[in-house]
C-alpha cells in the first residue's frame, strides 16, 4: 500500500541517545545509534521503498520523563523539540512532529505544548509514560489532580496525546527480579502503560474532557482484549471505593482512545483489535528504529483484512485524526 502514515517513529538527540542502549544487543547498538540520529537519509529511503508517505516523529524513551530535575527536563524537552522542528522543516511533505513534554512540571509542560503546537506546527505530543521528579523515586501518573489543567489545554488545542511505554521504576519491578527478559517491550512496557491508561479512564478525566484523544501503541498494550472482563468484574464491586468515572471503561476506550500497529505485526491480533475497537480507531505504525520498516510494511500490505480497512488504518484514519487534509 502506498501513501501510508506512520506515527510511532522515534529519533534521538545526543543527550537522550544513551536511554535506548539497554533495549538492543551490544553488537547492534552502533546501528541503532545511526537509525535514531538519522532523519533525512536512511529513514527517507526506507519510507520511499515501503510506501510510507508521512512519519510523525517523536523522541526516544524514557528521555525527558526520566529526568527528575525539573529545570533539566524542561531544557531537554525544549531542545529536542527545537531540533525536531528544524528537521521537519527540511521536508514538511514527509515529516510531522510530536512534542516531548516535561510533565514533571505541569505548567511548564502546558506552556511547551502550546509553543510546539501554535508556534512550531506540531500535531500533538508523545510522552514516555510516568514522569520522575525530585528524588526520582515517586512516579507521577497523569490521572493525578495536578494534571487536570494540562489536560484541559490538550483538549483546547485539539491535538492527540500518545502515551508511550517505559519500564517501571526498580522498586516497582520486583516481580521481574531474576527475569530481565520480561522487562521492556517483551511485557513490562505493556503492563505499565495499560495500567496508566486504565487509571486515566477510571479517574473521571474523560467526563471532564470528553474530546481528548489518547493513542496507545503496540495494538493497544493488550487492553482491547481485556475491556469486557474489566467492566464485568467492576460491575460486581458494590461497596466503596468505586472508581470515580461515570461510565464503563469500555465506553472511554471506544470513544477517547486510538491504537497503533507499532511493533505488533500479527494478523490475528489486528483482526481482534478491529472487532474490539473498530477499524476507524486503529492506525498504522512501525516503531522504527526498534522494529524494521520493511517488516511492518510488508506484513501490513499483505495482511488478511478488508481493503477498505487497510486504507483506513494505513492512511485515512491518521489524516483525519491529525487534520492533515485541513479538516
Swiss-Prot record:
Bound cofactor: record note: Binds 1 Zn(2+) ion per subunit.
Active site: 287
Cofactors: Zn(2+)
Biological processes, Gene Ontology terms: secondary metabolic process
EC number: 4.1.1.103
Thermal characteristics: Optimum temperature is 70 degrees Celsius.
UniProt binding sites for 2,6-dihydroxybenzoate: 23, 164, 287
UniProt-recorded Gene Ontology molecular function terms: carboxy-lyase activity; hydrolase activity; metal ion binding
Recorded catalytic activity of this chain's protein: 2,6-dihydroxybenzoate + H(+) = resorcinol + CO2; 2,3-dihydroxybenzoate + H(+) = catechol + CO2
GO cellular component terms attached to this protein's record: cytosol
Description of activity control: Inhibited by CuCl(2), monoiodoacetate and diethylpyrocarbonate. Inhibited by 2,3-dihydroxybenzaldehyde, which is an analog of the substrate 2,3-dihydroxybenzoate.
Reported pH dependence: Optimum pH is 8.0 for decarboxylation. Optimum pH is 7.0 for carboxylation.
Residue positions binding Zn(2+): 8, 10, 164, 287
UniProt induction comment: Induced in the presence of gamma-resorcylate.
Keywords tagged on the record: Decarboxylase, Lyase, Metal-binding, Zinc
InterPro entries noted in UniProt: ACMSD, Amidohydro-rel, Metal_Hydrolase
Annotated pathway: Aromatic compound metabolism
Protein family according to the UniProt entry: Belongs to the metallo-dependent hydrolases superfamily. ACMSD family.
Assembly with partners or alone: Homotetramer. Dimer of dimers.
Role description: Involved in the gamma-resorcylate (2,6-dihydroxybenzoate) catabolism. Catalyzes the reversible decarboxylation of gamma-resorcylate to resorcinol. The reaction is reversible, but equilibrium greatly favors the decarboxylation reaction. Also catalyzes the decarboxylation of 2,3-dihydroxybenzoate to catechol, but does not act on 2,4-dihydroxybenzoate, 2,5-dihydroxybenzoate, 3,4-dihydroxybenzoate, 3,5-dihydroxybenzoate, 2-hydroxybenzoate, or 3-hydroxybenzoate. Only resorcinol is carboxylated by the reverse reaction.
Protein name according to UniProt: Gamma-resorcylate decarboxylase
Organism: Rhizobium sp. (strain MTP-10005)
Gene: graF
Amino acid at each position: 500500500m502506498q501513501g501510508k502514515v506512520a506515527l510511532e517513529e522515534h529519533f534521538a538527540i545526543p543527550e537522550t541517545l544513551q536511554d535506548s542502549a539497554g533495549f538492543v544487543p551490544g553488537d547492534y547498538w552502533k546501528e541503532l545509534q545511526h537509525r535514531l540520529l538519522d532523519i533525512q537519509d536512511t529513514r527517507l529511503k526506507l519510507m520511499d521503498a515501503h510506501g510510507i508517505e508521512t512519519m510523525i516523529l517523536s523522541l526516544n524513551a524514557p528521555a525527558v520523563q526520566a529526568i527528575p530535575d525539573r529545570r533539566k527536563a524542561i531544557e531537554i524537552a525544549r531542545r529536542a523539540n527545537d531540533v525536531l522542528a528544524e528537521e521537519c522543516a527540511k521536508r514538511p511533505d514527509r515529516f510531522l512532529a510530536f512534542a516531548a513534554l516535561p510533565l514533571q512540571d505541569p505548567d511548564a509542560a502546558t506552556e511547551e505544548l502550546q509553543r510546539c503546537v501554535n508556534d512550531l506546527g506540531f500535531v500533538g505530543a508523545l510522552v514516555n509514560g510516568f514522569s520522575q521528579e525530585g528524588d526520582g523515586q515517586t512516579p507521577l501518573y497523569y490521572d493525578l489532580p495536578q494534571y487536570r489543567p494540562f489536560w484541559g489545554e490538550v483538549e483546547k488545542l485539539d491535538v492527540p496525546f500518545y502515551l508511550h511505554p517505559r519500564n517501571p521504576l526498580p522498586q516497582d519491578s520486583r516481580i521481574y527480579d531474576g527475569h530481565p527478559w520480561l522487562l521492556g517491550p517483551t511485557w513490562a512496557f505493556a503492563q505499565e502503560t495499560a495500567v496508566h491508561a486504565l487509571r486515566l479512564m477510571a479517574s473521571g478525566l474523560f467526563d471532564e474532557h470528553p474530546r481528548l484523544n489518547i493513542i496507545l501503541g503496540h495494538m493497544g498494550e493488550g487492553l482491547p482484549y481485556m475491556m469486557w472482563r474489566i467492566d464485568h468484574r467492576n460491575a460486581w464491586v458494590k461497596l466503596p471505593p468505586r472508581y470515580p468515572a461515570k461510565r464503563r471503561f469500555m465506553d472511554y476506550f471506544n470513544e477517547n482512545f486510538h491504537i497503533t500497529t507499532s511493533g505488533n505485526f500479527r494478523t490475528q491480533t489486528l483482526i481482534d483489535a478491529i472487532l474490539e475497537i473498530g477499524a476507524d480507531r486503529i492506525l498504522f505504525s512501525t516503531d522504527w528504529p526498534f522494529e524494521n520498516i520493511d517488516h511492518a510494511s510488508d506484513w501490513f500490505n499483505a495482511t488478511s483484512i478488508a481493503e477498505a480497512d487497510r486504507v483506513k488504518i494505513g492512511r485515512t484514519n491518521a489524516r483525519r485524526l491529525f487534520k492533515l487534509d485541513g479538516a
